[in-house]
Amino acid sequence: MAEYPFVGTGFHTGDGYVLTNRHVVQPWLADERAQSLTSTVNGKPRLKKLMAFFPDSSQSITLKYKQAASGEDVAVCTIDPKDLPAKLPVLPLEKESESVAIGRIVVTMGYPSGPERLLAMLPEDEARGIQSRYGSYDSLLTYLAQTKHVHPLMTQGNITDLDARRIVYDARTGEGGSGGPLFGPSGRVIGITFAIFTENTASNFAVPIHYAITLLEKAGWTSPATPEADATNTVQAAAK
């Protein structure tokens, strides 16, 4: 049996509901290694476990895959109520489509390059020592969480193109940033990053958030009455 670790981004929308990409929770749909293996071996890929690491939370959290959209690259996961951190921020979702337009400022948040980027933020000797002691993704990310080194990358850009099914933007991100929120000028989430082109920084794609809201509501989610103010303020400050 072959096992491969995969890293992506997701975000909390309230009551333990987490949004991400379908290809993050079903990585074999987009991964060449898994596709090659299943085509040559009589086997079926499956998700062994799905763990989340949030900033300011020292423990990993088990996610349960709930459902995915059939057409768009969006998936909903849930956190068991007993595992839900008391002060886990809720990211507010934009319901007004008029706020999305070509030229508007956007901010993306995520974990491009996964733990490799987190290690790169540390002194070289310290990072090398950590990597030698914690070989697997599980143990490495657990250590980084316990030492408060799990922090997303935030970058600013603009919407460069737009149609009914995708938002094209030029804020820099990378592999591992898939599933991350794309914020509009109001600080609300307007999309979910699903495709990243490293050779062309002006062509990262996001699924418009209304597709995700529909999927969330089908899964039983209800919109919070008052979104977390600190999440909005953080993004607004970065967009200035």
Where do the PLM segments sit?
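N-terminal activation segment of mature serine protease catalytic domains
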Residues: 1-24, 65, 71-75, 87-89, ...
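Catalytic-histidine neighborhood of serine endopeptidases
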Residues: 7, 13-15, 19-69, 81, ...
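Catalytic nucleophile loop of clan PA
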Residues: 11-12, 154, 159, 172-193
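Conserved hydrophobic/aromatic beta-strand scaffold that supports enzyme active sites
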Residues: 19, 74-78, 154-158
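A structural micro-motif recognizing beta-strand termini
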Residues: 55-56, 77-85, 92-97, 170-173
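Flexible, gly/ser-rich surface segments that form the specificity/activation loops bordering the active-site cleft
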Residues: 67, 89-165, 173-174, 195-204
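Short, solvent-exposed secondary-structure boundary/capping segments
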Residues: 72-79, 165-172, 203
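C-terminal subregion of chymotrypsin/trypsin-like serine protease catalytic domains
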Residues: 149, 161, 183-240
